[in-house]
Amino acid sequence: MRQVTVTEHLLLHQTKSPAATGQFTALLYDLILAAKIISKSVNKAGLLDVLGGTGQVNVQGEHVQKLDEYANRVLIHRMERTGVLCAMASEENADLIRVPERFEAGDYILIFDPLDGSSNIDVNINVGTIFSILKRKPGASGSKDVTLGDVLQSGVEQVAAGYFLYGPSTMLVYSSGQGVHGFTLDPSVGEFLLSHPDIRYPEQGRIYSVNESYWHYWDEPTREVVSYFKGPDNPLGKPYSLRYVGSLVADFHRNLFYGGIFMYPMDYRLPEKPQGKLRLMCEASPLAFLAEQAGGRATDGTKRILDIVPGELHQRVPLFIGSAGDVDAVEAIYRRHS
């Protein structure tokens, strides 16, 4: 069987996708190179001094893992040199990351979570890099004077989104608006090869993923949502299977293939985070883009995730994402309580 690389796949789809320009291809190429470097360190994490925390706390109020910090450095170092970016934003950085004056600037904006699920790395559970690609608004092309207003765009304006999953094999799953495609890294040739073309969600899932230990911090509609999947009064006529790793990208990836729903609702556990834990721009929005391209849906309970215009760089949102029928059921329950 003829193997198709990511670059070949992009070139084949350039006529269909306005995103697949030469600049976009160059951007994705450098992003893939950064992911290969990160993957190599993740695979050797138990042999290198990269396990555990740094002792620092990031802008999210979370303890920084050594691999978090390393992945963040790799991505910034590689991507600021591409010549096609005007700015970046990372889960680990409080402010916009601007392209230094010594490098050329382009019109693309890269937003990323450098190592999602990194708290699990010490016990060898899958982690990943989530990314979102935007284009700056017209009228400022070629300028490095990027404002927050250029970056705070709704998810529907994304040019592309995806993630790298570091596990038994390293995968790239991405979409530029022409479906969702999966590529697996062949370490013998150092290339991501097309392994899962045109990924589609099953219309109705069999899995629900949520941290049920927060039950006592949820409101009544949220408890009803979870009870719906735990009980027999659903299209399956029996309880869904609970599968929850605690690594967003790993849980999303499994449910994308098997069907089901991932939920991280708002809770009252932490008063400073009333909207839940997940970040709109570097987690919820890129995964929502993938979900919709794969025939699924993503909502905060009442609103489509891709329609939410962020008011700040690190805005948090509740997230219900997965098979369309399952997300429809969630919204129906919240509507009854509104």
Curated annotation (Swiss-Prot):
The UniProt entry, under SUPFAM superfamilies, shows: Carbohydrate phosphatase
Q: In which pathway does it act?
A: Carbohydrate biosynthesis; gluconeogenesis
**What does the record list as GO biological process?**
fructose 1,6-bisphosphate metabolic process; fructose 6-phosphate metabolic process; fructose metabolic process; gluconeogenesis; sucrose biosynthetic process
Keyword Transferase, does the record have it? no
- The record lists Mg(2+) 1 as bound by E91, D113, L115
Keyword Metal-binding attributed: yes
**CDD domains documented for this protein:** FBPase
Q: Which residues form the signal peptide?
A: none
Keyword annotations: Carbohydrate metabolism, Cytoplasm, Hydrolase, Magnesium, Metal-binding
Which is an annotated GO molecular function term of this record? Answer: magnesium ion binding
Q: Where does substrate bind?
A: D116, G117, S118, S119, N211, Y244, K277
Name the InterPro entries on file: FBPase_C_dom (IPR044015), FBPase_class-1 (IPR000146), FBPase_N (IPR033391), FBPtase (IPR028343)
What's its catalytic activity? beta-D-fructose 1,6-bisphosphate + H2O = beta-D-fructose 6-phosphate + phosphate
Chief localisation class: cytoplasm
Q: Which cofactor does it need?
A: Mg(2+)
Major enzyme class: hydrolase
EC number assigned by the record:
3.1.3.11
Which Gene Ontology cellular component terms are annotated? cytosol
Localization recorded for this chain is: Cytoplasm
Q: How is the cofactor bound?
A: Binds 2 magnesium ions per subunit.
Q: Which residues bind Mg(2+) 2?
A: D113, D116, E283
Q: Which family does it belong to?
A: Belongs to the FBPase class 1 family.
How does this protein assemble? Homotetramer.
Protein name per the record:
Fructose-1,6-bisphosphatase class 1
Q: Which organism is it from?
A: Oleidesulfovibrio alaskensis (strain ATCC BAA-1058 / DSM 17464 / G20) (Desulfovibrio alaskensis)
Q: Which gene encodes it?
A: fbp
